[in-house]
From Swiss-Prot:
It comes from Chlorobium chlorochromatii (strain CaD3). This is Methionyl-tRNA formyltransferase. The keyword Protein biosynthesis applies. GO terms for molecular function: methionyl-tRNA formyltransferase activity. It is an enzyme of class 2 (transferase). The gene is fmt.
């Protein structure tokens, strides 16, 4: 089986490595990724994507693409005569590209479709307080994330697990699912099931707007929102007109309580830093103020010199 793998971030790397280890006629003929990113320093070499680095380590051919809709790209894909195209965290492919695969093109998606269709399924699942998620492989079709499902694998979301941690776990779970999906396609027993659009939910791209913290919410909701955006792009608020990124929190009550404090108030109690939501206090554990390095919230609290007093955060 001739396989083309398309992907960019770390999420795609375990799948590439797992396919490369299959042997027995499962051959990666090309790895497609985005173009190298220029670094901030003028003298530094451009940065290759994680999947390109992994592909080169495996001595696999790599093609960097700028525009997947360029007709020339479809011609390049066709020239490799792929039996299957495997996509993991890549761009939206046009039919002219994915139709080049003789046995079909499938995507590895980090949710239990039709839940959380879109660019940020892991983040939104945690932000919404889900206790379970998983991965799905499905055949590509023109509408994004709507193709027929080949395989799914569920996993529980731990109460304190953040998006960065969960993405790593799902990438490894997904690699096993990708391998089994390829085996089923090769054996011509890849049974599929259509998605029920009535059960669909969205996971839109993360932006500066939808990652800002609204403190007028219950602390459990705030905790989920913050861990769902950690460590990147991170949830944020403002403090003294500067951006304050919040990386880690825990549900904890301070000894010095100010029950009438408005939402968004900061409190330092016994060296710990808390912020008030709509129904109580949330302990902050790790953060970063604009212009400074990431730090433990306790270190930030020591610089405030306001033990037992409530300050307005936003």
């Amino acid at each position: 089986m001739r396989i083309i793998v398309m992907g960019t971030p770390d999420f795609a790397v375990p799948s590439l490595q797992a396919i490369a280890a299959m042997g027995n006629g499962f051959d990666i003929v090309l790895v497609v990724t985005g173009q190298d990113k220029p670094r901030k320093s003028k003298h530094a070499a451009a940065e290759a994507s994680p999947i390109k680095q992994a592909a080169l380590a495996l001595n696999l051919p790599v093609h960097e693409v700028d525009d997947v809709n360029d007709p020339h790209f479809a011609e390049i894909v066709a020239a490799y005569k792929p039996d299957v195209i495997v996509v993991a965290a890549f761009r939206i492919l046009p039919p002219a590209v994915y139709s080049q695969a003789r046995l079909g093109a499938f995507n590895l998606h980090a949710s239990l479709l039709p839940a959380y269709r879109g660019a940020a399924p892991v983040n939104w699942a945690i932000m919404n307080g889900e206790e379970e998620t998983g991965v799905t492989t499905f055949f590509l079709q023109q509408r994004v994330d709507t193709g027929t499902i080949i395989m799914q694998q569920k996993t529980a979301i731990a109460p304190e697990e953040n998006a960065t941690e969960l993405i790593v776990r799902l990438a490894n779970i997904g690699a096993d699912v990708v391998v089994e999906t390829l085996r089923r396609i090769a054996a011509k027993n890849a049974a599929t099931a259509p998605q029920d659009d009535s059960l669909a939910s969205r996971a839109p791209k993360l932006t500066r707007i939808n990652t800002r913290i609204n403190w007028e919410q219950p602390v459990a909701t705030l905790h989920n929102f913050i861990r769902g955006l950690a460590l990147k792009p991170s949830a944020w608020t403002t403090f003294n007109d500067k951006t304050l990124k919040i990386f880690r929190t825990t549900l904890s009550t301070p000894e010095h309580d100010h029950p009438s404090a408005p939402a968004g108030s900061l409190l330092v109690s016994h060296g710990k830093l808390y912020v008030h939501g709509s129904d109580g206090w949330l302990e902050l554990l790790a953060l970063q103020l604009e212009g400074r390095k990431p730090m433990e919230a306790a270190d930030f609290a020591r610089g405030l010199h306001v033990e037992g007093e409530a300050l307005r955060l936003v």
